């Protein structure tokens, strides 16, 4: 349910970008249909106007300048806040006079980020939004995204490989693998259903007997495993148990699927 910040997670080729393109009618699904408030999205300009997708594909010609792109966006999205867009461009150091084709990979991402943060659409689909950004600009983006959601709650679908960085923002996780949805639940609920255990390999193996480990790794005589099931209140003697984090859980789940 929306509003909310949804994380769309998956390895390369899992189908994340394909799914986003289907949601925005850039691609047509082989089966099924996309509905918004119970209404089909295909050939529905009113419904599509409620969505804004940030992706690698440019909305405007490469020869257009950033300033001109902002002005064009105001024509298509009445809620677009061009004054705020200019202010954010200044914060990121984005030159409004630059042609889109002249922007570096990082600044192309920044240009798209500024549009997404100010367009005013109730549904934002962000496909790898921080591609090419340095750590400082990524941090600024995450802060601005939280500010946007706090001021104007909307539905944000964030596709990213930087799970550890984005995890604090994600309230609901959708995990894809080879075109299939493996998990689709609140992040807190997913992580409550798995835990880690570590210690001497023999003791860990004994602990895993009768349980379902997702993955395990060994270093010397020590072993660590991700285990499905709630974390026990007290760890067995000689072992340490802990909560799972979203990135570790994702990696463990991918390892389980690759078996």
Enumerate the language-model features and the residues they cover.
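Conserved ABC transporter NBD signature motif
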Residues: 1, 32-47
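Walker A (P-loop) phosphate-binding loop of ABC-type ATPase nucleotide-binding domains
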Residues: 11-15
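Helix-to-loop junction immediately C-terminal to a conserved catalytic motif
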Residues: 24
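ABC-family P-loop ATPase nucleotide-binding domains
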Residues: 53-112
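Catalytic Walker B motif of ABC-type/P-loop ATPase nucleotide-binding domains
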Residues: 124-128, 133
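ABC ATPase "signature
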Residues: 184-185
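C-terminal coupling/interaction segments
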Residues: 212-215, 219-259
